[in-house]
Amino acid sequence: MIILSNKPNIRGIKRVVEDIKYRNQLIGRDGRLFAGLIATRISGIAIGFLLAVLLVGVPAMMSILGVI
């Protein structure tokens, strides 16, 4: 008959489980970040275009019209 220990050494198993949890969280975080970037892509391009028009277009129009 084989005698089994009452307290098996499971430190290695716990370490592997923690590593798997950590890696899973990293993969999930990257997936959520990428999904958020894709979802806000169009609005970000539109806001950037409008900001560029304001920063470049308004002073150009003012100099053409002779206001400045």
Curated annotation (Swiss-Prot):
Keywords: Cell membrane, Membrane, Methanogenesis, Methyltransferase, One-carbon metabolism, Transferase, Translocase, Transmembrane, Transmembrane helix
Membrane topology: Single-pass membrane protein
GO cellular component: plasma membrane
Biological process according to GO: methanogenesis, from carbon dioxide; methylation; one-carbon metabolic process
Main localization, broad class: membrane
HAMAP family: MtrF (MF_01099)
Subunit architecture: The complex is composed of 8 subunits; MtrA, MtrB, MtrC, MtrD, MtrE, MtrF, MtrG and MtrH.
Name of the protein in question: Tetrahydromethanopterin S-methyltransferase subunit F
